[in-house]
Amino acid sequence: MVFLFTLLNYIIIILLTLWLLTSLKQNIETKPPLPSPTPTPTPSPTPTPTPSPTPTPTPTPTPTPTPTPSPTPTPALSPTPTPSPTLSPTPSPTPTPSPTPSPTPSPTPTPSPTPSPTPTPSPTPSPTPTPSPTPTPSPTPSPTPSPTPTPSPTPSPTPTPSPTPSPTPTPSPTPSPTPPPSPTPPPSPSPLGDPMYFPSSVGTTDQLRDYIRPLCNGWPRPRETYAVPWDCQRVMHCSYFSLPLHEVTCNDDSAYSFTADGCVPHYQSDCPFYPLNTL
């Protein structure tokens, strides 16, 4: 029974709260229409102050009547407080009229016209162009340099000697024939080097090879080629393309510079060998 009783109490409380909520909603819905018309008239007077700047450009005394219309909006605000006690949320729109004082700074632009006369003095420096006549004398000196160019034609005869150097290049072709004599030095016996002597006991190619082998390896700067004394055109090379002590014939092998006109003495041949003479 106690449980049922408590349930009934809860149901009653819920019903009461619902009823209160609905009644409050109805009151709120009915009352907002009243403040809604009030804000509409209040903004309408605010645009009216905009015409007030128009009188300011005309005479300066006109700004004095502008304060007189300012009290007229104040009675329009007086009816607005009457709805404010009816609803607590309405005070939020009431601050909106505060922007109305903002138009009052509009008279401050009036000083701006006063600086406008200040630019007028800027034209006063315009008399400065008076120095412009002074540059006019400067053109008068310019004719004076004109006589100076007249001596310039006098150097013109000096270029006439320039043709005289032209004959000098003609001797330059004379050195060009000098290169042809350069081929003449090859026949000289200078590449032969100093003659080298070998013992008279050496009489065959094998004996000569055995005699030359230590000479190819032992000297600090070993000779590369040696002439065979019993053959005018045969040369013994220490290392002929990695072949040790290879015999080369000057007339047949193109690896050497040689004369192919028969057997000639070693001192006349241009083969790069060192002649060997018998002791």
Swiss-Prot record:
Residues 31-203 are annotated as: Disordered. Keywords: Disulfide bond. GO terms for cellular component: extracellular region. Transmembrane segments: none annotated. It comes from the Viruses. One of its GO terms (molecular function) is chitin binding. Disulfide bonds join C250-C263. Residues 32-192 have a biased composition (Pro residues). It holds the Pfam family DUF5478. Residues 213-273 form the Chitin-binding type-2 domain. InterPro entries: Chitin-bd_dom, DUF5478, SDr-like. This is Uncharacterized 29.3 kDa protein.
